[in-house]
């Protein structure tokens, strides 16, 4: 009697199930394997991107496939897929035969913040118009909780990303969310947070408060203006950071 299943060991005879059942089981298993592989690729991508964002791999750092696989406990195939994806997104660039973390020059930095101000301002405007009451309450709670993180720039930076992501989602515009995801992935190349600059944390929380207040009031113009002002001040702080770093290297 022949048996149906992976490697002939599923435990159900062909007499009972028939050949079609074997085919179905094989297809289902194939889909499960594809899902697992896609999950691994996604996880490897996220792990590497988070490591860049947290400064573990700074601009100019070489990304070695075998080292990444060992660090994250992932096989080399999903690591390779993730590196290819990051290269396509220009977060990694080729230097000879090596892949290195990309860096942003002054013009690229200015372009990034200009696009971010436009898109995030629009997201805030749309959130004021379309956000559910529950979403607005979540934003309010975030501001209250984040104020307790002043003094911990790394934790506040993570909270800041969650806050901005919540505004993106509250816009209820999937195409805008997609573009903002790309912008924020590129922000990972900055490696350091402007919230570490003295006084910036308190100021940023106040700016978040103004954004949420405008969204609560359903005032799209005010929400747009508050978000743009927030990005403008963040860019100004970033420029000071870059200038200070350049002086340190001189």
Predicted segments, located by residue:
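Short amphipathic alpha-helical segments with heptad-repeat character
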Residues: 110-117, 216, 224, 228
